[in-house]
Amino acid sequence: MTLIDEASTPQREATPAAHAVDLCKTYGTGDATVHALAGIDVTFERARFTAVMGPSGSGKSTLMHCMAGLDRPTSGKTYVGDLEVGNLDDKELTQMRRDRIGFVFQSFNLVPTLTAGENITLPADLAGREVDREWFDYLVKQLGIDDRLTHRPTELSGGQQQRCVCARALINHPDLVFADEPTGNLDSNSTAEMLGFLRRSVDDFDQSIVMVTHDHQGAAYADRVVFLADGKVVDELVAPTADSVLERVRTMGT
């Protein structure tokens, strides 16, 4: 399928890209017990951009890690599509993350000995999969790093490194992208460029994205914002604006 074909494909019905049922995650024992997730039920729709917000310690990153198979929940179930993550062994989890999920983290996690281009194609290389060169060319051009592909991470700015991470997350056409504070180390211009690209990947290619963020302006790029507090989903907002997100955050704090 070409980029033109893919872009013109009618948007699929918004069935879940991922969902959790009564998800709990507990750390410690006795008086030191911390309930990071306390019975969360949440659905992330396919071909939608969802932001997850909440105060520090509310369970945002823990939720993402459990749903992506990076951490095991104490109880409850998580699904990526119709695949129950809890039923997978370590090898199957690795394969699922490699084949079906893309990750964008605040820390870039680029391999220092590889060039930017080699870092981007790493997921396909590890999977033994031929790189979709048309998709690769599209990604690096859209992200403005097509002239930096032979440079190593230390030769790139923070914004350029994060664009490489974004391209790497999308190179295998994942079912779902999890982004944990992806703009935390970026300046305002790089932040706007990154969020604009994520928004376009949803609008143009039906990509499904879940982004953890503290930034009310960044959350306004999403279709929906889910708010967490004390390990629970406490509110949500559809078609957010920066002002409506900020007002909701202020209300939660009272």
Put a short name on every predicted segment.
Residues D5-E6, H65, D132, D243, ...:
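Polar/charged alpha-helical tracts
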Residues P10-R12, Q217, L237:
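A general boundary/transition motif marking the beginning of the first structured unit of a protein
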Residues K232-T254:
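Conserved beta-strand-loop-alpha-helix hinge in the C-terminal portion
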